[in-house]
Structure formats: structure tokens, C-alpha cells
């Protein structure tokens, strides 16, 4: 009971609650108070602006003053901190903190909160010029220059901001026209001109901004120092050394390295093709004589033989009328073009029934093709095997092909052979009656018990 009574008596004697009530009546809603209990300190928040007779457009700097008041106040100095500074440099913020600390130490033991708040306003009023540079032109602000402040406390020269707004309005108009051309429907409403620093929507009067004078900034001529000149010389020598060793890549030369120009200059006329203007016209008789002479010269030139493509085909072992031994490959040259045959007789390519060889039209005898003037290709001449059905003896051995004379066997012509409709691949071979044993021809082995087509 005694402890609680002493605590209540101490709260009644504490000057902080009464001082806070006075501050709330002066600053109204600008002051925010967070009351603590007996162990935690109180906190007071207030946003300070320069004293400009409530003209907000002339207030270019501000900050939020935070005071943490301990339980032993006023016999203990409150903790001072600055938050959310606008238009102030770090150096200025540090100076403001030091100035407020000196005021608090001087008023130790008395009510000092009002003095701290008013000292902060006084410092802001004296430094009502924003520190820093215009983010558009990157020049600092001077006292006699026309500059403006946005609601988000960012600062620009009036002339620079007017140019920025005009540019952004043109960009927005171009985007709207492009969307209308492409028939794009935007669900979100188009946002106006935004702050170039924080992208907050701007509230501006373009006419008044354009009427402001252009900021005059002194043009500073660059004069390199001796150290910078020495570094330039060293870099120049290094560049030359790298260029000599091929370490510098020329982008233009590399780009045109594999460039092929399709534009060629017109070729000059040769003396032979140029028209001789001084030459007199000749009569028609002379022209005809010259033409006949040129034709005679051309007729005396040696005529080259026509080049014919030699087509060859290979025969592999298998069933057929011209079957060969396994592992043996024969090649034959197809008949040459008709214009190279000379005065040869035309042969009928139609094949009679029974598989007889082709014969010339109007004749019943088998003739041998005369040899051409020059063989197109030295290959083995394929001979047609006899197709007589009653042949029972051993077939004659094929001799080497030759163009020197007639062969022991008849030769087929160069015409294409066709198989009759009622013949099978094995019907062109001679057949033995059933039960007469195997038929052997030379070293070739045929299947046993071959039957003829007619008998069964």
C-alpha cells in the first residue's frame, strides 16, 4: 500500500503529462503521443516544416522529430532522433541533431519539449533550400532560381519539370494511338505523368511551369591535371602495343570481313566486240561472200564424235533365263543411241510366242549385228542361250566375247528381251522327261527332276 501510494504521488508530481497536454493544444493533430507505463518511456512524434505562414508550396524541407522521454524526465535528457528527412543532406541532419542535443542539455531539470520542437522549426526555416541536384538536369539549386517541390517532396527546376511533363504527355498520347490502332483494350485506367524519382502521380500547372525562367548554370571548362595527362600517355602506349600484337579487335573490320559485294562495275567493251564506226558499209554481195567463206571454214574443222553415256547393268546370281554362276558378275553395255548406229537395219522389238529371239523385219534368218566403229566399253558380251524346247544335250560353253568375228553360237541383238505371259522364270531351261535322272551342265548344278511346261 505504501509503494502504490508513493507511485501515485510521484505521477501527480511528474510534469510530463501536463506538458504533453499543452503541446497537444498547440500543435493539434500534428503531435502524436505514445504513452508508456511506469517502466517504458513515452514517445512523441511530430513532423516539422519551415515557418512560411502556412504556404505549403514554399516549404521545401521537412523531417519527423521523435522524442523518447524517460521516466526520470526532466532530470534526464530525452533521446532525440530524426526520421524521414526531405531536402536535407546528411551533413545538415547531423548538425540539426547536435543543435537539438545542446538545447536539451541546457534545459536539463525543466520542461524542454516545446523548446526542442521550436528549435527544429527554426533550423528548417533557415535552411529552406533543398539540398542536392535536380534529377533532370543534374545541377544544384541556387537561391534565386525557380524550382518546385512535388507532394512527395522531390525537387526540380520549374523549367526542367515542364520539359519532362511535355515529353511524358507526348509519350502517353503515342501509346494511346498505338493501342487504338492495334485494337487493344486496356483494363487498367491510364496513369498520368508520374514523378521521375518515386513514380507517384504528379499534380502540376504546366502553364506556370513553362513561364518560369531557365536555370543559368555556369559552364565549367574541363582542364586535365598533370596526373590525368600522364595516365592518358600510358594508356595510349598500351593501346598501340596491343594493336601491334593483334589484341585490339576492330568491330567494323570484323563486320565486313566476310562481306561479299554484289555490285560490280560494268565491264568495258573489248576491242573485238566494239563496233568500228569508221568502217564503211559493204554491199550485200560482199556480205554473202563473207558468210559463205565462214561456213566453209567451219566445215573444215574436225567434227568430234558425239559423247554418249554408257549405261551398264550388273547381273547377279538368281533364277532367270541368263542365270550365271555364283560369285560371278557380268556387265553389259546397253545399246547406243540410234544416231550413232549408222545405216543399220531397224529390228522389230516384238517377241513371238515361244520365246524366239528377235529377228529383223521381213526376214526369217538370224543375223549377227555388225561391230561398231569403236567399242563404247570393253565389257563381256552377253550371249543369248538357245531356247529350243527339245534340247537334251549339254549346252555349249560360252566363249569370250569378241568383235573380231562370228561366235560359235548365235548372238542376240541389242534389243530388250521380254518374257511371255505364260512363262515362268524356270521354263527357259531344257527339261528332261520325268524319271530320266539329273541334268548336269558343266560345273553348274541344277535342281533334280525338272518338269517341262507341257507335261505333268
From Swiss-Prot:
Outcome recorded upon mutating residue 158 to S: No E2 binding. Loss of ubiquitination activity
MF GO annotations: NF-kappaB binding; ubiquitin protein ligase activity; ubiquitin-protein transferase activity; zinc ion binding
Result of changing residue 137 to S: No E2 binding. Loss of ubiquitination activity
Binding residues for Zn(2+) 1: 134, 137, 157, 160
Post-translational modification note: Ubiquitinated; autoubiquitinated.
Alphabetical UniProt keywords: Cytoplasm, Metal-binding, Transferase, Ubl conjugation, Ubl conjugation pathway, Zinc, Zinc-finger
Disordered: annotated span: 269-456
Comp. bias intervals (Polar residues): 288-332
Enzyme class: transferase
Role summary: E3 ubiquitin-protein ligase that plays a key role in the RNF14-RNF25 translation quality control pathway, a pathway that takes place when a ribosome has stalled during translation, and which promotes ubiquitination and degradation of translation factors on stalled ribosomes. Catalyzes ubiquitination of RPS27A in response to ribosome collisions, promoting activation of RNF14. RNF25 catalyzes ubiquitination of other ribosomal proteins on stalled ribosomes, such as RPL0, RPL1, RPL12, RPS13 and RPS17. Also involved in ubiquitination and degradation of stalled ETF1/eRF1.
Listed name of the protein: E3 ubiquitin-protein ligase RNF25
Amino acid at each position: 500500500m505504501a509503494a502504490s501510494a508513493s507511485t501515485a504521488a510521484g505521477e501527480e508530481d511528474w510534469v510530463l503529462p501536463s506538458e504533453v497536454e499543452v503541446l497537444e493544444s498547440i500543435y493539434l493533430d500534428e503531435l502524436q503521443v505514445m504513452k508508456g507505463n511506469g517502466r517504458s518511456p513515452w514517445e512523441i512524434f511530430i513532423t516539422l516544416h519551415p515557418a512560411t505562414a502556412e504556404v505549403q508550396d514554399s516549404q521545401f524541407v521537412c523531417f519527423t522529430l521523435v522524442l523518447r522521454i524517460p521516466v526520470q524526465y526532466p532530470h534526464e535528457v530525452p533521446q532525440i532522433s530524426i526520421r524521414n528527412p526531405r531536402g536535407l543532406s546528411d551533413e545538415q541532419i547531423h548538425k540539426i541533431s547536435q543543435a537539438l542535443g545542446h538545447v536539451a542539455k541546457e534545459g536539463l531539470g525543466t520542461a524542454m519539449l516545446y523548446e526542442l520542437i521550436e528549435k527544429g522549426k527554426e533550423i528548417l526555416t533557415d535552411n529552406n533550400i533543398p539540398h542536392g541536384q535536380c534529377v533532370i538536369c543534374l545541377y544544384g539549386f541556387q537561391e534565386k532560381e525557380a524550382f518546385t517541390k512535388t507532394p512527395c517532396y522531390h525537387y526540380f527546376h520549374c523549367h526542367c519539370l515542364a520539359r519532362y511533363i511535355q515529353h511524358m504527355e507526348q509519350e502517353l498520347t503515342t501509346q494511346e494511338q498505338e493501342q487504338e490502332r492495334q485494337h487493344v483494350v486496356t483494363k487498367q485506367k491510364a496513369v498520368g505523368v508520374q514523378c521521375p524519382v518515386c513514380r507517384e502521380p504528379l499534380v502540376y500547372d504546366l502553364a506556370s511551369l513553362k513561364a518560369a525562367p531557365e536555370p543559368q548554370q555556369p559552364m565549367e571548362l574541363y582542364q586535365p591535371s598533370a596526373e590525368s595527362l600522364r595516365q592518358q600517355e600510358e594508356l595510349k602506349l598500351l593501346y598501340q602495343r596491343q594493336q601491334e600484337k593483334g589484341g585490339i579487335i576492330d568491330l567494323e573490320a570484323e563486320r565486313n570481313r566476310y562481306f561479299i559485294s554484289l555490285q560490280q562495275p560494268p565491264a568495258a567493251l573489248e576491242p573485238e566486240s566494239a563496233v568500228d564506226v569508221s568502217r564503211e558499209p559493204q554491199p550485200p554481195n560482199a556480205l554473202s561472200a563473207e558468210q559463205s567463206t565462214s561456213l566453209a571454214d567451219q566445215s573444215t574443222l574436225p567434227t568430234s564424235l558425239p559423247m554418249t553415256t554408257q549405261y551398264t547393268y550388273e547381273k547377279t546370281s538368281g533364277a532367270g533365263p541368263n542365270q550365271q554362276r555364283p560369285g560371278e558378275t557380268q556387265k553389259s553395255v546397253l545399246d547406243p543411241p540410234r544416231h550413232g548406229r549408222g545405216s543399220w537395219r531397224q529390228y522389230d522389238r516384238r517377241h513371238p510366242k515361244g520365246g524366239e529371239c528377235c529377228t529383223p523385219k521381213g526376214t526369217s534368218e538370224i543375223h549377227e549385228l555388225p561391230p561398231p566403229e569403236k567399242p563404247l566399253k570393253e565389257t563381256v558380251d552377253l550371249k543369248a542361250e538357245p531356247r529350243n524346247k527339245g534340247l537334251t544335250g549339254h549346252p555349249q560353253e560360252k566363249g569370250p566375247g569378241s568383235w573380231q568375228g562370228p561366235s560359235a553360237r548365235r548372238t542376240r541383238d541389242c534389243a530388250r528381251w521380254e518374257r511371255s505371259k505364260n512363262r515362268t522364270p524356270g521354263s527357259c531351261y531344257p527339261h528332261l522327261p520325268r524319271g530320266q535322272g539329273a541334268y548336269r551342265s558343266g560345273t553348274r548344278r541344277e535342281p533334280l527332276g525338272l518338269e517341262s511346261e507341257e507335261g505333268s
